[in-house]
Amino acid sequence: MQNIDLISEEEAQKLLEELADKIAAYNHAYYIEDNPLVSDSEYDQLFNTNLKLEQKFPHLILENSPSKKVGAKIANKFAKVTHQVPMLSLSNAFDEQDVRDFVDRIKIFLRLNEFAPIFCEPKIDGLSFSAVYKHGVLTTGATRGDGYVGEDITANIKTIKNFPHKIDNVPEFLEVRGEIYIEKQDFLNLNKEQEEQGKDKFANPRNAAAGSLRQLDSSITAKRPLKYFVYSGGVTEQNLASSQDQLLTKLKECGFNINEISKLASSEEEIFAFYEYLKTNRENLPYEIDGVVYKLNDFALQNRMGFIARSPRFATAHKFPAIIGQTKLLSITVQVGRTGTLTPVAELEPIEIGGVTVSRATLHNFQEIARKDLRIKDYVFLQRAGDVIPKIMGVDFDKRPNDTETFDTPLFCLSCNSKLHYTPEDIIIRCDNGLNCPAQNYERIRHFVSKNAMDIEGLGRKQVEFLIDKGLISNLLDIFFLKEKNDSSLAKLENMDGWGKKSVENLFKNIEKSKNVSLPRFIYALGIRHIGEQNAKLLAREFGSYNNFIAQMELLRTNEPDIYQKLKNLEGIGDKILVDIIDFFDVKENIELIKKLGEILNIEDYKETREQSGLTDKIVVFTGSLPTISRAEAKATAEKLGAKVAVGVSSNTDLVVAGVDAGSKLKKAKELNIKIIDEEEWLTLIKNV
């Protein structure tokens, strides 16, 4: 990852785009498919890089920034449930200094001189849920979903042992929130049953719990050993108690399971002592935990602290360090991605780390192999922090056998056998054979039909692979003629292995439904390198319609200077991305394919649907000491109203709020003729907005 301190604005824009796309994909895999693609530590590293970039370049914050979201958009198979109070995730602390910073932020934000009591509890590695009771009767159970809208799992939640269906002496409306999990031994027993029945084993207890809870058939859920803890009261918690410790006492009296392992800390030392106790004893607990949650105990203080886009200010999760294991590197295989990138993968002697059997690990790129001096038959150290695909940290050179084998970077593509062109300095190695490469063609089709692109449900990885292998599709266009081909064929798809009449009918219905698509989705679906959802939206906004888009892209092929300059001037489209766009449309087959798709699809013109307010997208700078509110509280209010708060004044600044002893920033704002107001005017402004 690049050094944030040295990065240019153009590089930052590109990196923010890439991070938004990556994190969105990882969120979808984790929250919706229950199938994590990267380790917790890798995810946290990406997310923190995104935050640091946004802090340095606040004017570059994207509409689809990961810092504004939690979870992922829910799937379509369950009814939707809107949370009255968003179910947000927690910010992370990775060491004692991060925790001290969290405590200091509370003191500064609330202008406290003394330590405010912090409630500490284990962070259960399970699936978050909400349960709503009306007149004491359980009426709705829901998953977190994207934090704002979850999935209705009422029937499934009722099958969990000891989960109250009816409670007495509670308000007319009650919400509880908590975590559903599977204990370690139950997980091992469940996987043994899966294996005996010839079914796939679950990767870890969290996946097993999530998969069990998200069953359409609640009788399957009833057979799974699910357990739960409640830890908050959602929209109604402050009607029940005035603090977190009082709330849990009340919920326990109502018959809910609460985690008895907790601590009300009155100092930082007590916080760290509880953390060390749990870290030391985590392996002895019957369930998996991946850290400790700290939250302000006093609800009135929580209210004053409020929230940022994806997490509360009054709480944080102190993560445990990764679990380290050692195993043997058996071989290195190579995967070819959608844009031709070759990625090495370590095939390992299976090892159990933290209750999960691991047999593969990503190596990211070929320089990583050389840098760590990895050789086949080496004994390697693995890091796992909630991982499914963990990270190789290094080699145990003391145990290196005499017969190890070095890995040679391939000279030819492992999929199409075309020659690879690269230099020893290249970090990324790509196959340039495009759609003539079977692996790239397969991945491009997978991307085209994916949720955030054409959204063709029923065309998952296995189905696409099957249709290609059988010769039923070979490119994007073939998808829309699949029904016609099936109708005229003697070998019907519904009679083939893995298919049935209903699944085929649904597939054809979903393909037909996908023919109505927005311009941003269509552009994203094309799979142009570095054109993620945000850049696709930029292009759609610029060109407005499909006809104009394709016409302008054809002009780009003729080296038309006006269109080149127009693209270059788009915020977010730098030189490198522009080269990727040109390379894509330089391929005649790509233009022809897009034109044919344009004849089949109804590609809707771009429409700006975002609601605007007086402060939306305005860049605001606070300077000096504000008389009645803290700087942090003022910043939080501005961001809540859609403004972007910057640390310095520039020609892009829209508004400066000046307090007492405002210095150089105020002077610069006057020089640039930027609007300046005081705290009283600011409070009036936000009240009117």
Curated annotation (Swiss-Prot):
Its EC number is 6.5.1.2. NAD(+) binds at residues 40-44, 89-90, 121, 144, 179, 295, 319. GO terms for biological process: DNA repair; DNA replication. GO terms for cellular component: cytosol. It catalyses: NAD(+) + (deoxyribonucleotide)n-3'-hydroxyl + 5'-phospho-(deoxyribonucleotide)m = (deoxyribonucleotide)n+m + AMP + beta-nicotinamide D-nucleotide. It comes from the Bacteria. Residues 610-689 form the BRCT domain. Keywords: DNA damage, DNA repair, DNA replication, Ligase, Magnesium, Manganese, Metal-binding, NAD, Zinc. GO terms for molecular function: DNA ligase (NAD+) activity; metal ion binding. InterPro entries: BRCT_dom, BRCT_dom_sf, DisA/LigA_HHH, DNA_ligase, DNA_ligase_AS, DNA_ligase_CS, DNAligase_adenylation, DNAligase_N. Its cofactor is Mg(2+); Mn(2+). Pfam families: BRCT (PF00533), DNA_ligase_aden (PF01653), DNA_ligase_OB (PF03120), HHH_2 (PF12826). The active site is at residue 123. The keyword Hydrolase does not apply. Zn(2+) binds at residues 413, 416, 431, 437. Belongs to the NAD-dependent DNA ligase family. LigA subfamily. DNA ligase that catalyzes the formation of phosphodiester linkages between 5'-phosphoryl and 3'-hydroxyl groups in double-stranded DNA using NAD as a coenzyme and as the energy source for the reaction. It is essential for DNA replication and repair of damaged DNA. This is DNA ligase. It comes from Rickettsia conorii (strain ATCC VR-613 / Malish 7). The gene is ligA.
